[in-house]
Swiss-Prot record:
Record's keyword terms, sorted: ATP-binding, Cell cycle, Cell division, Cell shape, Cell wall biogenesis/degradation, Cytoplasm, Ligase, Magnesium, Nucleotide-binding, Peptidoglycan synthesis
One example GO MF annotation: magnesium ion binding
Similarity annotation: Belongs to the MurCDEF family. MurE subfamily.
Catalytic activity: UDP-N-acetyl-alpha-D-muramoyl-L-alanyl-D-glutamate + meso-2,6-diaminopimelate + ATP = UDP-N-acetyl-alpha-D-muramoyl-L-alanyl-gamma-D-glutamyl-meso-2,6-diaminopimelate + ADP + phosphate + H(+)
Full protein name: UDP-N-acetylmuramoyl-L-alanyl-D-glutamate--2,6-diaminopimelate ligase
Residues that bind meso-2,6-diaminopimelate: R386, D410, N411, P412, R413, G461, E465
Short motif Meso-diaminopimelate recognition motif, span: 410-413
Amino acid sequence: MKKLTALFNLPELKNDIELHNMVLDSRKVKAGDLFVAIKGHQVDGNQFIDSALHSGASAVVSETELSSEHLTVAFIRNVPVVKYYQLARHLSSLADVFYDSPSKNLTLVGVTGTNGKTTISQLLAQWAELLGHRAAVMGTIGNGLLGQIVEAKNTTGSAVEIQSSLSTFKHAGADFTSIEVSSHGLAQHRVEALHFKAAIFTNLTRDHLDYHQSMENYAAAKKRLFTELDTQIKVINADDEIGYQWLTELPDAIAVSMNADFKVGSHQWMKAINIHYHFKGADITFESSWGNGVLHSPLIGAFNVSNLLLVMTTLLSFGYPLENLLATAKSLKGVCGRMEMIQYPNKPIVIVDYAHTPDALEKALIAAREHCQGELWCIFGCGGDRDRGKRPLMAQVAEQFAEKIIVTKDNPRTEPQSQIEADIVAGFKNMEKVGIIPDRAQAIQFAIESAVENDVILIAGKGHEHYQIIGSEVVHFSDQEIALDFLK
């Protein structure tokens, strides 16, 4: 419980009020809660104050656009309503106070970048547990203690959800948490008051331009984690163009590279000298500030080499011995829907991956090629009501790296599938190796029944998701389940 005066020291509040939780959704308010009414992109929480009061809210903090109204108090049915100027921007700080600064009592690692956030955050949590910690994770797949993850709505939750979840993890015994930090979460100040032991930058490629409008805005949002927030250790992928630039601006950042010729300029660094890819993963010979060695990766694909090096570097920067990390690495496991391989005897190999940007699709196809002795198939679509500009770029990537391509549904949402397909098809030079099968299950069935034993089929775009959004309806759908049905 938290007293209202601990948040707002106001003389009008003569009788202090004990509060149970901070709640943003009026439908979830219970007796004793503080209802937070912020002006979001689609909904203004101030419209739901009456509903929250009916549900038993003990107090309300309400966003105002007038600085003159800041911390003024009105009473509705004897319930205090505190006006707060720029509430959304300061909500992380208020929630930090309300939940007793949980990130100060955890080792918190933030992971940002276009691709790799989920894999890295999951690997961090796995490795931390192998080193004796109780770890939790927050991100695209879900939130919770490792092994008890509950599905999440967004990659980065609301400022209140984040602080509340960290508090829950702490009280459940967690001492280590990795969190995916999206560009939306940074731009909307949802992680503002968190105390990061470290932050990792993976890469920056085209995504979310429907929201950010330009790559410059997108990069600026990501950069805030390293320049404006409370971040102690900065670990950056030097092979990314933006990452390399940031390393020149952040002298204390740690550089990580897969390039043996990388010229070290940072005071701490990690680089791969030789990488041997094989059917079960990769053997990575590396040099670093902490010593040299060979890391045996159980994950497939070159981009997972980068992911693993970023994770190991972060843990080395925390002081874990190199030999302990190398000994425990073999126990790491792949992440659901991230280059997830499904194999049956005498059948084509199926790989399910979340790749839904041109760069991620290219990397997934290159990784799949490592395991392909026959033809490489690519099944993909693009989400509706989202960045249309990346659709022809996805087509160009598929045409360059795959022998057979099937364009299908992803999550069309409210946009006509025919429009999405037209945008994708505009990117192909010719349609000789391209088929269009809108029904995703039929597309997967056709590929599996047409491909032969040495072929590889990459099913891209949905990964861990077990649903499709068609119109406003969410229907059950799993790439893995469909693939298994037709492989058996």
